[in-house]
Amino acid sequence: MTYEKVLKYVQEKKFFETHYNILIAVSGGVDSMNLLHFLHIYQKKLQIRIAVAHVNHKQRPQADEEEIYLKNWARDNHIPFYTAVFKGIFSEKKARDFRYTFFKNIMKEHGYTALVTAHHANDQAETVFLRLLRGSRLRYLTGIKEIQEFGNGQLIRPFLKFHKKELPNIFHFDDDSNQGDSYLRNRIRNHYLPILTQENPKLSQHLIQMSEETNLLFKAFSDLTSQLDIQDCQIFRSQSEAIQYFLLQNYLRKFPNLEVSKAQFDNLLHILRTKDYYYDYLKNNYYLKKDKKRFKICKIGPETDRFEGEKVLEYGSMVKYGQYIFSFQEGSDSKKGIPVKNDFPIIIRRRKPGDKIKLGSHSKKLRRLFIDEKIPIFKRSNAIIVEQDSDIILILLDGVTYLRKGFKDDIMKGRLYIQNRNW
């Protein structure tokens, strides 16, 4: 592959038409070094200004050498260079999350509107095969995208249509860990695909074609249903079950961090098909709100006091949570306060999926309790949960206290006192 071939493709796709400040993710391997040299050579022709971002994972003896080389190269070529060092227990996922968080922060702080990575066609084939192996649903078989939203801008992969063997063998650092079998992707790259390619030399090409066709299928479906207000319950339920299935899949693409499993997806679909009212936690700080007319998935904002985090109340101390002041003292006055153990801290938090409270000889899920008490759906997320030793002691909601039942008062040596700051 000549760089001129890539240049022609990049210009045809207009990858950088709306971008000037470009951040390049460079590991030091042959792929990213080719990307760096390509964009460095053609930055004037592409009318862009480039910078380099590198993460030192500290996993190999030559990691520091790579960082120093890239730093010096960037300095000699008058290119901004940003680096970060991964700390903590290493895993592929943790390292990836660290890298992309670092890239997002650099983009935001220094005004870069595009992150460029060196993923190529072999990476695409490996990704599709990996997802097939893991039993991923159809929409995940669309594979890696050439362009996607990322941070405050876009993530662009200009090499994605080109194979690794087409890249020039320029100076680079070899990563010995890519040859090991510790990671599934390495086993796919080094063993599974080579063996299967002996049966069909065009296997990688077919995997990529399947990914492209799957992507076209979803695009066609989106185009055909784009005029539907799918959050309108009447419109959603008027569709066939097959269309409902893919409408919901398309809707969930708006929430990439939600990551629902197949079982969770099926349950979500069942709720939309059968429930008139629903308001409950899904996962990863997302909630589903539904009434007879509309539904929506919403994310809890970190700035919202209503959803403040967990607090620990130690014996002999006091904390503020929401509109209440909680104090944990010795049970000297048996007529006041709520009896609790004095040898376990008290946890004050918001509701979690599956929460239960003991009511005598049985336990009841909070969701069922709220239904039985006819508490409106929109109020249920206001509940404050107080627990001790993994048991819910009480629930505070809308000025009403729901106490557990069936515990032995005589073994409770402490008292929990609650004061409403608004009274």
Curated annotation (Swiss-Prot):
Subcellular location(s) of the protein: Cytoplasm
An annotated GO BP: tRNA modification
Main localisation: cytoplasm
GO cellular component, one term: cytoplasm
Recorded catalytic activity of this chain's protein: cytidine(34) in tRNA(Ile2) + L-lysine + ATP = lysidine(34) in tRNA(Ile2) + AMP + diphosphate + H(+)
A Pfam short name: TilS_C
Gene3D superfamilies: HUPs
Residues that bind ATP: S27, G28, G29, V30, D31, S32
Enzyme Commission code(s) on record: 6.3.4.19
Domain of life: Bacteria
Gene Ontology molecular function terms on file: ATP binding; tRNA(Ile)-lysidine synthase activity
Protein's UniProt keywords contain Metal-binding: no
Keyword line: ATP-binding, Cytoplasm, Ligase, Nucleotide-binding, tRNA processing
Family of the protein in this entry: Belongs to the tRNA(Ile)-lysidine synthase family.
Task performed by this protein: Ligates lysine onto the cytidine present at position 34 of the AUA codon-specific tRNA(Ile) that contains the anticodon CAU, in an ATP-dependent manner. Cytidine is converted to lysidine, thus changing the amino acid specificity of the tRNA from methionine to isoleucine.
Domain notes: The N-terminal region contains the highly conserved SGGXDS motif, predicted to be a P-loop motif involved in ATP binding.
The protein's name in its UniProt record: tRNA(Ile)-lysidine synthase
Organism the protein comes from: Streptococcus mutans serotype c (strain ATCC 700610 / UA159)
